Amino acid sequence: MWFKNLMTYRLTKPLDWDLAQLQTQLEDCQFHPCGTQDQSKFGWSAPLRGSDLLYFSVGKQILLIAKKEEKILPANVVKRELDDRIESLEQKENRKLKKVEKQTLKDDVVMNLLPRAFSKNQHTALWIDTENNLIHIDAASSKRAEDALALLRKSLGSLPVVPLAFANEPSTILTNWILQDNLPHWLLALEEAELRGSQEDSVIRCKKQPLENEEILALLQDGKKVVSKLALEWEDTLTFVFNEDCTIKRLKFADTVREKNDDILKEDFAQRFDADFVLMTGILAKLTENLLDEFGGEKARL
């Protein structure tokens, strides 16, 4: 349940989050496992183990889980089976098969192999902050986040969202933090960053390297590079990598945070889940608020 990434979206207009209605809407897109002829399935799964509810809610915070099952068919296995069939049929009919015939054969091969294929399951968590009209998604890629949002949009009928963007250019702020050594008091720069030039392929990745290094500072001072990613630590609470597109990757909560609710018995799974969710959302909501303040608020939209 602890988020490892944070991609945040702004609801451009408030929605009515009636929980009874939400449950009904989510049930229309509930996850069901792949049948023998299904290549993939995508739908809502219960966040709380053993619960029939397809959402988990505390106060004004809602948690959803989008589950995806994909059948894994290695391309070389499909190709080998297909090549055998094509060769056999061409010899039998003494002619070369047409492209459309080969595609039909391939579809048939896939359908025959699917029942024996392994499954890969993927869970994507969506945290809806109804108080601040934000949706946070635990996803490392825009595609995965957009897929989850598309499922929510399908369930609700509409979902007016845009990626959260800051008023001040993040790369400019990040660069100034390193150049002028003026990070906010609540943040500590770690020894990892990515420097980007004007050319897309002109990227320098620094790892386990002090960022006050003379060569790094010279590149930034000359304007040849800007800081596009920066590893940070926040108040001994968590570490993360902040990206210039306003996304957060590799979130890692401190052990002292994750152990805060250890006094709750392991047998009381629901209470522990509740307490951890409240703790996590409180921390990440505060982090989002602090970042918004530090980057000049939210970018104005036309």
From Swiss-Prot:
Cellular localisation: Cytoplasm, Nucleoid
Claim: Transcription regulation is one of the keywords in the record: no
Annotated Gene Ontology cellular component terms: bacterial nucleoid; cytoplasm
Keyword annotations of the record: Cytoplasm, DNA recombination
Function according to Swiss-Prot or TrEMBL: May be involved in recombination.
PANTHER family given in the database record: RECOMBINATION-ASSOCIATED PROTEIN RDGC
Family to which this protein belongs: Belongs to the RdgC family.
Protein name: Recombination-associated protein RdgC
Lineage: Bacteria, Pseudomonadati, Pseudomonadota, Gammaproteobacteria, Pasteurellales
